[in-house]
Amino acid sequence: MKHLLTAADLSREDATAILDNADRFREALVGREVKKLPTLRGRTIITMFYENSTRTRVSFEVAGKWMSADVINVSSSGSSVAKGESLRDTALTLRAAGADALIIRHPASGAAQQLAAWTLDEHGGPSIINAGDGTHEHPTQALLDALTIRQRLGSVEGKRVVIVGDVLHSRVARSNVALLHTLGAEVVLVAPPTLLPVGVADWPVTVSQDIDAELPLADAVLMLRVQAERMNGGFFPSSREYSVRYGLSEKRQSRLAEHAVVLHPGPMLRGMEIAYSVADSSQSAVLQQVSNGVHVRMAVLFHLLVGSEQEAISA
């Protein structure tokens, strides 16, 4: 496997190998005073973030550094992009500089695929990892969500995962639908009709507008942020109305099964799509997701740069 561009790129075997290795990396680092493994020593990883990010950017940087790779950050404000350089020319420059992997977040859907095409050469070019492209995909987020579900519930297969909120603008939702389906979960989307994408009827999901009917049946609930920055019209009457209809309040949380887990990709709009008390409750796995993000991204880098057949952990 050369690139990770979409969650659909992952076979069940690939996804399971990445999740298993993420757990191995987590276990290998427990108790280490210096969190360093030699796995990617001598490799160069470059992050290219053209959109704001905290969790994804930091976790990729930490993942690379914990594996002893050289991690270099390129941003639009601090590079020749600010002078008008195209994404293609930037990518070719970084390939020529000897990057082993390019990790890109970009506002344009399809940017990661373009990067893979532009950087292909007779040696194969660097591995490309999609860290979020527009409203299209965010495959490593789906992997860390799946890992969190597996850790909390024992497995992903056969579990009912309810995804609530702004599905229309959510790359997280698209990647989760694809990966959860691959891993054998049942996926339910709960959203107002205005926040569902065209063609959702062809997705391997059940669609509902009734959050109260779905919560008691859920093994996991993934709450999505309303992405106001991607909206240029009225998708719902008001923030208050949205919260009343689709927010995960403390009262709604009481309808969840005792074993059910609450997920959120962040950043959270507390008080809108999720109540303060719910976000901080024992059923919430939000901080576990962040921790898993580092280990999953370590496993993805290992999978692409070393190979799934190699030993993931060495002292």
Curated annotation (Swiss-Prot):
Reaction(s) catalysed (UniProt annotation): carbamoyl phosphate + L-aspartate = N-carbamoyl-L-aspartate + phosphate + H(+)
Residue positions binding carbamoyl phosphate: R55, T56, R105, H138, Q141, G266, P267
Top EC category: transferase
Alphabetic keyword roster: Pyrimidine biosynthesis, Transferase
Family: Belongs to the aspartate/ornithine carbamoyltransferase superfamily. ATCase family.
EC number, as in UniProt: 2.1.3.2
Positions that bind L-aspartate: K83, R171, R225
Coiled-coil intervals: none
GO molecular function list: amino acid binding; aspartate carbamoyltransferase activity
Protein's UniProt name: Aspartate carbamoyltransferase catalytic subunit
Superkingdom of the source species: Bacteria
InterPro entries in the cross-refs: Asp/Orn_carbamoyltranf_P-bd (IPR006132), Asp/Orn_carbamoylTrfase (IPR006130), Asp/Orn_carbamoylTrfase_sf (IPR036901), Asp_carbamoyltransf (IPR002082), Asp_carbamoyltransf_Asp/Orn-bd (IPR006131)
Quaternary data: Heterododecamer (2C3:3R2) of six catalytic PyrB chains organized as two trimers (C3), and six regulatory PyrI chains organized as three dimers (R2).
Gene Ontology biological-process entries: 'de novo' pyrimidine nucleobase biosynthetic process; 'de novo' UMP biosynthetic process; amino acid metabolic process
Pfam families, per database record: OTCace, OTCace_N
